[in-house]
Amino acid sequence: MVQLRKLLRVLTLMKFPCCVLEVLLCALAAAARGQEMYAPHSIRIEGDVTLGGLFPVHAKGPSGVPCGDIKRENGIHRLEAMLYALDQINSDPNLLPNVTLGARILDTCSRDTYALEQSLTFVQALIQKDTSDVRCTNGEPPVFVKPEKVVGVIGASGSSVSIMVANILRLFQIPQISYASTAPELSDDRRYDFFSRVVPPDSFQAQAMVDIVKALGWNYVSTLASEGSYGEKGVESFTQISKEAGGLCIAQSVRIPQERKDRTIDFDRIIKQLLDTPNSRAVVIFANDEDIKQILAAAKRADQVGHFLWVGSDSWGSKINPLHQHEDIAEGAITIQPKRATVEGFDAYFTSRTLENNRRNVWFAEYWEENFNCKLTISGSKKEDTDRKCTGQERIGKDSNYEQEGKVQFVIDAVYAMAHALHHMNKDLCADYRGVCPEMEQAGGKKLLKYIRNVNFNGSAGTPVMFNKNGDAPGRYDIFQYQTTNTSNPGYRLIGQWTDELQLNIEDMQWGKGVREIPASVCTLPCKPGQRKKTQKGTPCCWTCEPCDGYQYQFDEMTCQHCPYDQRPNENRTGCQDIPIIKLEWHSPWAVIPVFLAMLGIIATIFVMATFIRYNDTPIVRASGRELSYVLLTGIFLCYIITFLMIAKPDVAVCSFRRVFLGLGMCISYAALLTKTNRIYRIFEQGKKSVTAPRLISPTSQLAITSSLISVQLLGVFIWFGVDPPNIIIDYDEHKTMNPEQARGVLKCDITDLQIICSLGYSILLMVTCTVYAIKTRGVPENFNEAKPIGFTMYTTCIVWLAFIPIFFGTAQSAEKLYIQTTTLTISMNLSASVALGMLYMPKVYIIIFHPELNVQKRKRSFKAVVTAATMSSRLSHKPSDRPNGEAKTELCENVDPNSPAAKKKYVSYNNLVI
């Protein structure tokens, strides 16, 4: 009892849970009272060195019963794998020569508390019993049979069982090597310092499963875990790694409760809960065999064949038993298990086991009944659901299905790892000793642990067996998919592997009904090209899709960005492309009309000019003022020419000519007309005051005045050239519409609207001034001068330009600005030139060509007579007319012989007075 109290203090300092202490004390108390009888269900094999073994030979029993049905694969296969490995090692002269390995193998019944109670058997030899007060009937002290010393333990299977057992074994410094426990917390070398395993931890497995899920394009999954360390810690690792990897969301994390009376209801509720998130079709499972079987059955009851996409951990692996009668629900399931190979020697060994040659396995008879569905005649048979008698002649693999269980390889590797450690320890401590020397006998578990962590050999699968500083094996996994259709061999198919990185053969995968296309398990379908994701708060894998609008393109899946200034989005808005460059084309309707008018005007102007040159010395041509007439015709011609410059493809030369000729044609035209109207006005104003002719009315003076007016325009253009040299630009604002598809860059000269108005402003000023003079000279007789035709010309021109201004500026924001403004400007200039050409020149050309009899010189008058006649005409114009058409018209000129001396003497020259 003293030893028990000491152990209690030690366990208390280790902060064991109260329930563990209670179980431990009860078991130790029984051992201390001298109960040396071994449990009826255990295997004991004599040897120089004894290894412990923990295997889930039976499933959990119902409430109140420790053990349930026998587990043929996970239990018996694994247990026999240890016995097979012991046989191989004991028969190997090169491994532990002269040393025989024994074993003490116990059943954990897949329950951690029961396994803890059973594992106390391993520490009995290390507990010193106080027998001072115990005497036999003869007064002699009792003789106790000392239990064999267990130097190391192989097991356990479930992580929760291994954790419970590891807590007690570390107290007695007994090394432990597991063949199936993968819980990440067992990697904590401070808490489980005597624990090692030949399988990788779930942290590697979880990483592999995350990689699989991401490779299949699934970003919205649910997790399902059996209650306990393996399931809960596995899901915890998966969740943590998925968060670190990003792009993967957990829809639901469901835990499968244990120790419930009616578990069928629980599994039906779990399936219903998983269906609450229908888009989360992928379900990552960290569960034991029984829970996997029950969850598949519940899914089948819910008629969800083909809905769930199962991703199973190594507890599912490539096992057949959990899928029995639920193959349709499991079709397409992806499972993972540590990389392994079939141990052929074990197959031969196991299939040769019979009731006669395998009496050392105390559970083999029960396995025989379950495997062959028969009943043995021996008492204590548990097979009550059949009347078929076992003959003992049945053979495994012939009379029953047989497939090597997935963890057999790792059981063998675990036993060999312990054997290699003992071998090296024996060589170091017992170099000159055959068998187990006293030094090795007295060596503690810490020393053996050191040798275990340093082993490195090729295991039964040909892969290296080694441990890192935490006692973990490297991560190497095979990836399987359960396939039943379109295959000659239904079952698990190897589709990839994971060794630090994923290698997955997606082309070998298939899903329900043989479908090859990977089904979706996403919260929201991927956005279309040109749309960005707008995630929902708290669920980054769920989003709404928002189109990139305007001039934005999809920069990445979360962001829309504006295209550069000179680009627009491409058709699907996944990038940008250059905005097309346009200019006013010759074939455009906007250009055809101005060009047509300009060509007609140029032809007419050339015709008029040719006519005037041909009839240069005729009275009408001379009377119209030949010098200014040619100047005016030049201006009209330039007004037509500017149309071609405005439509031509812009370059530096074209832009230079545009600047020069844009206002020059109008300036020349209106400078000549202004000079004419000003001369008329001054002549008649001067005539009212005196008979002396005004100054500067000679042709030379008129040309000088006109030239000076034109030079102002040219000076302004030269200043413009100096301040802002001609250049071409591409204007992207002018044609940047709301719809990017219609956006265009306009190739044009670097001339702003304001500069155009400034260039035309001087000409417009001349036009307005000329109009004012035309109004003032409106009373001059029409046959005497050109004042009235000039007046009509200016009135019409003003109307044209008054219409031009609102059209030009009113379309400044229009997408058709280039076309409208260019067309408006050129047509306005064409109309202005045509009005002047038509009103001032066409009547004269008509007379010259069709009525040459009227093209004669009229009688000359003195300057005073001209003025007096004009004054009288102005007065008579207010009196009623006796003519039929009501005209108040006075003929001031008579036909006279110009060569008569009287004419030369009494009259001034007509040519000097007629305007």
Swiss-Prot record:
GO terms for cellular component: asymmetric synapse; axon; cell cortex; dendrite; dendritic shaft; membrane; plasma membrane; postsynaptic membrane. Residues 35-590, 649-654, 724-753, 811-825 are extracellular. It is a multi-pass membrane protein. This is Metabotropic glutamate receptor 7. The chain crosses the membrane at residues 591-615, 628-648, 655-675, 703-723, 754-775, 789-810, 826-850. Residues 616-627, 676-702, 776-788, 851-915 are cytoplasmic. The keyword Transmembrane helix applies. Glycans are attached at N98, N458, N486, N572. Its main location: membrane. N-glycosylated. It is linked to Neurodevelopmental disorder with seizures, hypotonia, and brain imaging abnormalities: An autosomal recessive neurodevelopmental disorder characterized by global developmental delay, hypotonia, severe to profound intellectual disability, early-onset epilepsy, and microcephaly. Neuroimaging shows cerebral atrophy, thin corpus callosum and hypomyelination in a majority of cases. Death in childhood may occur. Belongs to the G-protein coupled receptor 3 family. The gene is GRM7. Residues 874-895 are annotated as: Disordered. Expressed in many areas of the brain, especially in the cerebral cortex, hippocampus, and cerebellum. Expression of GRM7 isoforms in non-neuronal tissues appears to be restricted to isoform 3 and isoform 4. It comes from Homo sapiens. GO terms for biological process: adenylate cyclase-inhibiting G protein-coupled glutamate receptor signaling pathway; adenylate cyclase-inhibiting G protein-coupled receptor signaling pathway; axon development; chemical synaptic transmission; G protein-coupled glutamate receptor signaling pathway; glycosylation; negative regulation of glutamate secretion; regulation of synaptic transmission, glutamatergic. It is found in: Cell membrane.
